[in-house]
């Protein structure tokens, strides 16, 4: 049985840890509100961009001059897998769930004989995938020194992806991230970026009122300008969803840790009090026994 001194030290240690987890929970809660607002504000713009692309893409059906970012290369042999995670841990299974989904996709492609290249965004994803896919990682991004993720970071990633695509390095690009739902729910999500994935009902959801639109210049020229911007927008939305999800998961994880620390302190206090009571009882028995012997 642990001594009273050991128990006091353990109680003090757990209380110190509880203070840290409580502080981290409060910090995550403060950051979550801003991150959630940013993620929710980005969704309508990205969805509207999908609808614009759907309308423009309709006019490109069957045309041989469709932009490569929309039409693709005509092959799906080489895949670029973009894995977006957090740079830091202590957020429950947030990072591991994204990596797990990406790893399943990678293993499936490899099993089909496809070539896979990986671009990681976030230190946790890079570290996890380096263990069994180090040779496939072509580029890694970290934003540990950046206080708030901005559109310029998404544009930087987008430029890298487009440069790799134009250099013939891959045929299909898919990004893996976590879609924020609420504090306790983040959904690991996969979204195809190249060729641009246009929802089948996006174009039909726009009421054209029977009007016929003429584009100047034509759809192809407009798409050449819009598609790179759309790629940046979709990556930016994924990053914002990730940030909100990370803080939500961290807030939940630290809340659980704080509660668990409280439960442990109660159990240790009970053990301490019982040990102390047993020690006092033993000393009393010894005193009484000594007195009777006299």
Swiss-Prot record:
Subcellular localization(s) per the UniProt record: Cell inner membrane
Keywords assigned: ATP synthesis, Cell inner membrane, Cell membrane, CF(1), Hydrogen ion transport, Ion transport, Membrane, Transport
UniProt keyword annotation of NAD present: no
Membrane topology annotation: Peripheral membrane protein
Pfam family, one: ATP-synt
A single MF term (Gene Ontology): proton-transporting ATP synthase activity, rotational mechanism
InterPro entries reported for this sequence: ATP_synth_F1_ATPase_gsu, ATP_synth_F1_gsu, ATP_synth_F1_gsu_CS
Gene Ontology cellular-component annotations: plasma membrane; proton-transporting ATP synthase complex
Role description: Produces ATP from ADP in the presence of a proton gradient across the membrane. The gamma chain is believed to be important in regulating ATPase activity and the flow of protons through the CF(0) complex.
Family affiliation: Belongs to the ATPase gamma chain family.
Record protein name field: ATP synthase gamma chain
Source organism of the structure: Parvibaculum lavamentivorans (strain DS-1 / DSM 13023 / NCIMB 13966)
